[in-house]
From Swiss-Prot:
Location within or outside the cell: Secreted
UniProt keyword terms in alphabetical order: Amidation, Neuropeptide, Pyrrolidone carboxylic acid, Secreted
Modified-residue entries (Leucine amide), positions: 10
Stated name of the protein: Locustapyrokinin-2
Residues with Pyrrolidone carboxylic acid modification: 1
Native organism: Locusta migratoria (Migratory locust)
Function: Mediates visceral muscle contractile activity (myotropic activity).
Family classification: Belongs to the pyrokinin family.
UniProt cross-references to PROSITE patterns, sorted A to Z: PYROKININ
Alphabetical GO biological process terms: neuropeptide signaling pathway
Gene Ontology annotations for the cellular component aspect, listed alphabetically: extracellular region
Length: 10
């Protein structure tokens, strides 16, 4: 998977 997964930062 080339597209990185979005990780929300709180």
């Amino acid at each position: 998977q080339s597209v990185p997964t979005f990780t929300p930062r709180l």
